[in-house]
Amino acid sequence: MLLKNCKILKNGKFKKVDILIKDDKIEKISENIDVTDENTIDVKDRFVTAGFIDAHVHWREPGFSKKETVYTASRAAARGGFTTVMTMPNLNPVPDSAETLNKQLEIIKNDSVIRAIPYGAITKEEYGRELSDMEDIADKVFAFTDDGRGVQSANVMYEAMLMGSKLNKAIVAHCEDNSLIRGGAMHEGKRSAELGIKGIPSICESTQIARDILLAEAANCHYHVCHISAKESVRAVREGKKNNIRVTCEVTPHHLLSCDEDIKEDNGMWKMNPPLRGREDRNALIAGVLDGTIDIIATDHAPHTMEEKIRGIEKSSFGIVGSETAFTQLYTKFVKTDIFSLEMLVKLMSENVAKIFNLPYGKLEENSFADIVVIDLEKEITINPEEFLSKGRNTPYANEKVNGIPVLTISNGKIAYIDKEEINL
């Protein structure tokens, strides 16, 4: 396959090149490649970069295919420019043993249009009491997490980190102290009081992060914090890094884009975990991205049926979708307004993910994997959930106008998504 008239970023500047793909690798990047008998695609001077890597998605299968399937989720991710994703273990069965993990791997092998690497659970059934068969499944999983739940016992988390260190696998944590949730459904603050909805305080997250950073230091383990949301959490991670503790973290697009002040009414589409916090928290997250405290952006794509999201904030399920809109929203809100550079955003969504987790992806260079996304930076669309490839329609961002639209995604050398109105084969 030959991609003609590609506009890539080289040392902060755009450069026009052609890209030759052989099998699953990039064979050559050069000006005016002339090869006969190749599938040639003219991308017409659109921006081309390494495919995005999402370290946090909920693909729901096996167990919850009413919400999403591996096939629909992978198509949605490809449409958003993602070529590699890591799938969370809150499934049925939970991938906590070789037997249960293999069920998920078989579905991924048969149905996914992009590269998908599963997480293994930290504890059996994600109950937080007994470690999963970590040694048995380590070679087949990306890392270990009980995402969806915080590991409540410090001792269990410490034992998991010791095992993670032994296996050279990261321990990835959804941080939430159950004793501090107190029946809350959104951030505890002025807005929750105005809406009459029980709130979840920021310390529910930050205290567990602080605990785990010290445990990671003791265990010499790579500790990665999921979907960081509070200013105190950013401070804890920043201090951990200053002390050379092996801590990394991610932020979601929605926590960068919005705060609790944007919740104008009791609408379940705004319910997510962790919740959107205050304006100061959002500003701290943006500052954390800019100063490198926050390493990567991950979507936390969490599809639900509409029935689960139309009950108001207190009774609706936690979670919003993000695979198809992450880059477009971030490009529109942060790159076009000169808060982030395009190069920074791309790194946050690809190269940095590969770097912190030691993956051989996230590069647009010769001999690297042919994971590529072509983006029309000028094209504008209006977000329409009814047009999503995901089964999930649960987003509060419907009708938002965005630029920077992926029109072609190539994963492992194969076309995973193509906008046939924009790209001619």
Predicted regions and their residues:
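N-terminal metal-binding scaffold of metallo-dependent hydrolase/deaminase domains
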Residues: 1-35
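C-terminal cap of metal-dependent C-N hydrolases
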Residues: 6, 312-315, 369-425
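Active-site metal-binding motif and surrounding structural segment of the metallo-beta-lactamase
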Residues: 32-49
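A glycine-rich helix N-cap at a beta->alpha junction
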Residues: 106-121
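Histidine/acidic residue-rich metal-binding segments in metalloenzymes
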Residues: 131-297
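His/Asp/Glu-enriched, well-ordered alpha-helical/loop segment
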Residues: 194-222, 269, 290-291, 295-297, ...
